[in-house]
Amino acid sequence: MSGMSYHDATSPIHRGVFLIRFILGRTLRPPNEAFSPLSPDLHPDLTTRERVTLQSSPDNCQVCHSKINGLGFALENFDAVGRFRSQERAKTLDSTGKYVDRDGNEVSFSGPRELAEYIISSDDAHRAFVNRAFQHFVKHPPAAFGLHTLDELTNAFRKNNFNINELIVEIAIIAATRDPSLSE
């Protein structure tokens, strides 16, 4: 948690970006313009969530922040160093969030436990895990071995009850038997 925070404050944006890119396997464009986060000193009565919502509310920001913020807000129960908390600035924390998956389904969650339960069952997360595992072991993206390789591996991973050993075997078979130069 502390790696995705400032030294004295949480960063739902950094936490949300990490989750969306590395856990859920989605891509984000860089911001259209540079900005500096609002200092907590400028709005001492606002929680981090309220400050982030204020700063990222313009429509041009919402293109990405509508995806990012909800994921990060679900982790607001953890302070800058990862300690659990239920209040910030004498206010009860709001750790509810939303996420729209690749298929356009909106998922709502309240807090880190519900977020974790969603991720465990998420097709986006399963696909991202398979993709990262393939790239780790083979040093190439799955698409280099065929347009449907990632789908095949993700379906096999699911069929094998998310058995990582079986996934590694499937990856090894594909890497050993398919020529990336002949991919579809």
What is each PLM-predicted segment?
Residues 1-137, 147-184:
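Active-site substrate-binding loop specific to GH73 endo-beta-N-acetylglucosaminidase modules
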Residues 138-142:
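Axial heme c-ligation environment in periplasmic c-type cytochrome domains
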